[in-house]
């Protein structure tokens, strides 16, 4: 995924498209993640997505659902933004 991407559009299971603002991209333990928030909605929480490759080699974004992995991403995110 390009580091200069500011917004992405994701499609949910029902085909509804939502535009998200990319807050940051993180490289953790040989995996890439993006932290996003819905662009036109007020929310208190960001969403962590892992960048994987599908069977065709295309990049896909997968929600981080395992607690251990989510905590690792959240910790890296907090560390990054506590330094600013």
Curated annotation (Swiss-Prot):
InterPro entries, per the entry: UPF0473 (IPR009711)
Instruction: Kindly give the Pfam families that the UniProt entry links to this protein.
Output: DUF1292
Q: Which superkingdom, per the lineage?
A: Bacteria
Which family does the UniProt entry place this protein in? Answer: Belongs to the UPF0473 family.
Protein name as it appears in the record:
UPF0473 protein CLD_2004
């Amino acid at each position: 995924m390009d580091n200069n991407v500011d917004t992405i559009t994701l499609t949910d299971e029902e085909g509804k498209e939502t535009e998200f603002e990319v807050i940051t991209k993180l490289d953790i333990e040989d995996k890439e993640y993006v932290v996003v928030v819905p662009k036109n909605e007020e929310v208190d929480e960001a969403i962590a997505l892992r960048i994987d490759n599908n069977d065709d080699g295309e990049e896909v974004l997968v929600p981080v659902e395992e607690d251990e992995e989510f905590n690792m991403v959240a910790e890296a995110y907090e560390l990054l933004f506590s330094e600013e």
